């Protein structure tokens, strides 16, 4: 994609730098037209082209939105959904409370009706007694006392029912608060378990990589040991052949001395290869001990690496807790940004300044040099805020 020009790219893949390349190409075309026909030909066309390129720059910069804004938008949607769920739960709880209150009011109304009915009966009995001139007997007096006692029992029962229902409502409220706390604790535990799971997966990958490295070391050591054993066997075979050859030759003493020296040299070579057991400077460990040392070293390296990972994880967790802000959502600045001059406008203003200097210079060579310097300068320094943001995400 590097060889494709900005005009041949897909519209969705355009960046602010591509817009600047298009502006540079348009400026070169304007240069050719001015060289042939003069500045008056494109005097009215140039501001319109500059405006179109500025609009294209703004649209391209809007397409490259910062991913952090997208994450904040998703977080805002999630918080809104949680808020709606909480509101629905509260509505459900209020409906339950309303049902309980309706039941309580119905029972209270029934008891009040009974009280009013008993009071009416009592009044009726009192009026009947007042109209009669008969003296109250002891039996009737006890009956009247029994009616008042019944009313007191009904009132007492009504009060107990009201207190009981009030206690039930308070208990329901406490249960709801406890359930909300349990839900929040479970959410925190879930996030903590997700972090631990991620850490464990990272450790598993590290251990697997170390296991592969140990297996490769084991294979290399076995191959090395096998080659050394083969070399030792070949050396033993050669020594045996030399001994047989020397035994078959019975010549002069000088030749015997030579054979003895050759035999001693061969024995010295074999002993030198297989490590002299009488040498005090020879290594004091076997191949299995070497493997154990290497295995222990790799285990210690793995432990050190895991401890470093744990330390980095806890440091990052502490840094996150310290950097938490009290507000849940970022406050959007209501002040409008100060409008800055567009890179396209700077490009064409620089181009127009160069064209004003052209009658005083040679037309072709000096203009090409000034335009090349302008393009390099524009690429390095003249960027709008949208262009800088696009370059950061490229």
Curated annotation (Swiss-Prot):
Residues 282-347 form the RH2 domain. Keywords: Cell projection, Cilium, Coiled coil, Cytoplasm, Cytoskeleton, Protein transport, Transport. Residues 68-327 form a coiled coil. GO terms for biological process: cilium assembly; epithelial cell morphogenesis; nitric oxide mediated signal transduction; protein transport from ciliary membrane to plasma membrane. Residues 2-89 form the RH1 domain. It is found in: Cytoplasm, Cytosol; Cytoplasm, Cytoskeleton, Microtubule organizing center, Centrosome; Cell projection, Cilium. GO terms for molecular function: dynein light intermediate chain binding; protein dimerization activity; small GTPase binding. It comes from the Eukaryota. Pfam families: RH1, RILP. InterPro entries: DZIP_RILPL (IPR051241), RH1 (IPR034743), RH2 (IPR034744), RILP_dimer (IPR021563). GO terms for cellular component: centrosome; ciliary basal body; cilium; cytoplasm; cytosol; membrane. Plays a role in the regulation of cell shape and polarity. Plays a role in cellular protein transport, including protein transport away from primary cilia. Neuroprotective protein. Belongs to the RILPL family. This is RILP-like protein 1. It comes from Xenopus laevis (African clawed frog). The lineage of its organism: Eukaryota, Metazoa, Chordata, Craniata, Vertebrata.
């Amino acid at each position: 994609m590097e060889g494709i020009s900005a005009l041949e790219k897909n519209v969705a893949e355009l960046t602010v730098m591509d817009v600047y390349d298009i502006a540079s190409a348009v400026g070169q075309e304007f240069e050719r037209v001015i060289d042939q026909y003069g500045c008056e030909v494109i005097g009215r066309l140039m501001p319109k082209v500059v405006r179109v390129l500025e609009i294209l720059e703004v649209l391209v910069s809007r397409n490259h939105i910062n991913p952090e804004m997208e994450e904040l938008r998703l977080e805002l949607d999630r918080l809104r959904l949680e808020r709606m769920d909480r509101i629905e739960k509260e509505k459900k709880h209020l409906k339950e409370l309303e049902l309980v209150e309706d039941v309580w009011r119905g029972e209270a109304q029934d008891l009040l009706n009974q009280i009013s009915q008993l009071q009416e009966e009592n009044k009726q009995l009192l009026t009947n007694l007042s109209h009669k001139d008969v003296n109250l007997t002891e039996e009737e007096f006890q009956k009247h006392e029994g009616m008042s006692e019944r009313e007191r029992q009904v009132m007492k029962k009504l009060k107990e029912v009201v207190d009981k229902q009030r206690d039930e409502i308070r208990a329901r409220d406490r249960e709801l608060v406890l359930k909300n706390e349990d839900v929040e604790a479970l959410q925190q535990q879930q996030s903590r378990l997700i972090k631990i799971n991620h850490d464990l997966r990272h450790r598993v990958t590290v251990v697997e990589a170390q296991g592969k490295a140990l297996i490769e070391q084991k294979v290399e050591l076995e191959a090395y040991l096998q080659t050394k054993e083969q070399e030792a066997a070949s050396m033993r075979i050669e020594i045996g052949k030399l001994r047989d050859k020397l035994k078959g030759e019975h010549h002069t003493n000088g030749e015997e001395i030579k054979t003895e020296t050759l035999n001693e040299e061969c024995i010295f070579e074999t002993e030198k290869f297989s490590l002299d057991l009488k040498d005090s400077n020879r290594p004091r460990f076997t191949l299995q001990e070497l493997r154990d040392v290497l295995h222990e070293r790799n285990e210690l390296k793995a432990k050190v690496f895991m401890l470093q990972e744990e330390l980095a994880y806890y440091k990052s967790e502490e840094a996150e807790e310290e950097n938490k802000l009290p507000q849940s959502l970022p406050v959007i600045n209501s002040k409008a940004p100060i409008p800055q001059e567009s890179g396209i406008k700077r490009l064409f203003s620089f181009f127009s300044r160069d064209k004003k200097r052209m009658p005083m210079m040679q037309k072709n060579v000096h203009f090409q040099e000034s335009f090349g310097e302008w393009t390099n300068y524009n690429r390095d320094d003249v960027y709008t805020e949208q262009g800088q943001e696009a370059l950061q995400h490229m």
